[in-house]
């Protein structure tokens, strides 16, 4: 689902479409690759309909520029339909394509797959804006420009305070088990953890020192402003 702040502040029509997804494991701690591939292959006909829909909406709206936030189907739209509108891609993942970016020593197949997926999202792009806190040179031949992430006005207007708690974000809610285990060893430390766990209350209060919160941009920023430290399993934008 779309974040509330996006829906409220975009001030433009929003047209949803179905897109491929990675499905989590039963414990919701990592991607289930086999399950994800099978699920997405079964829904290929829907994704092709989405590609046609994206192409149609680009034409009907008379878009001058298409801004793509790491969406696979937008890249495929430019591969198969060749829209005339200029496309600009924005994501921290485009830093993976920068020749000066150093990867940790990981499985070569996994890294090759990640780069391949990233390139598909940017098929036909005039520019790839790679988000990074570190300055790096442009790569004109590949259309890569490294830019810092933008901060929302609400973040800049927030006044920092000295809170006595740790703040965190879990991309996969299954890691809540690890948080609870750590909390048992360190019960005196107050924790406010955000997640996107379905079918739970906005706040799950384990005890007086540990709370899990559903994603809420206003509350998230408020807790971040007073945290002693911040920990996250993912979410470059929050960092």
Q: What do the PLM-derived regions correspond to, one by one?
A:
Residues 1-4, 70-73, 131-136, 193-202:
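Short, polar loop motifs at secondary-structure junctions
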Residues 1-45:
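Conserved nucleotide-sugar phosphate-binding/catalytic loop shared by glycosyltransferases and other
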Residues 30-65, 73:
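Conserved nucleotide-sugar donor-binding subdomain of glycosyltransferases
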Residues 66-81:
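An aromatic- and histidine-rich active-site surface loop
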Residues 66-69, 219-239:
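A donor-sugar binding/catalytic signature common to diverse glycosyltransferases
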Residues 81-146:
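Active-site-proximal region of nucleotide-activated glycan assembly enzymes
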Residues 139-141, 145-146, 150-163:
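Acidic anion/phosphate-binding donor-loop and adjacent secondary structure
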Residues 152, 159-226:
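Donor-nucleotide binding loops and adjacent catalytic segments primarily
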């Amino acid at each position: 689902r779309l974040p509330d702040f996006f829906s409220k502040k975009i001030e433009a029509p929003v047209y949803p479409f179905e897109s491929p997804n990675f499905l989590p494991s039963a414990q919701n701690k990592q991607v289930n690759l086999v399950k994800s591939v099978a699920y997405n292959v079964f829904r290929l006909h829907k994704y092709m309909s989405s590609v046609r829909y994206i192409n149609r909406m680009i034409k009907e709206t008379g878009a001058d520029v298409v801004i793509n936030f790491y969406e696979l189907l937008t890249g495929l739209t430019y591969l198969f339909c060749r829209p005339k509108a200029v496309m600009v891609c924005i994501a921290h993942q485009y830093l993976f394509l920068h020749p000066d970016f150093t990867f940790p020593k990981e499985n070569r197949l996994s890294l090759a797959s990640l780069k391949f997926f990233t390139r598909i999202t940017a098929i036909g792009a005039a520019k790839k804006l790679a988000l990074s806190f570190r300055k790096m040179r442009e790569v004109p031949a590949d259309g890569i420009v490294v830019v810092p992430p933008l901060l929302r006005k609400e973040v800049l207007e927030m006044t920092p305070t000295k809170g006595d708690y740790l703040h965190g974000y879990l991309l996969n809610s299954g890691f809540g088990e690890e948080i609870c285990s750590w909390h048992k060893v360190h019960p005196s430390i107050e924790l406010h953890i955000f997640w996107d766990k379905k079918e739970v209350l906005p706040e799950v209060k384990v005890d007086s020192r540990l709370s899990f919160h559903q994603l809420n941009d206003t509350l998230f920023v408020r807790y971040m402003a007073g945290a002693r430290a911040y920990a996250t399993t993912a979410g470059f934008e929050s960092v």
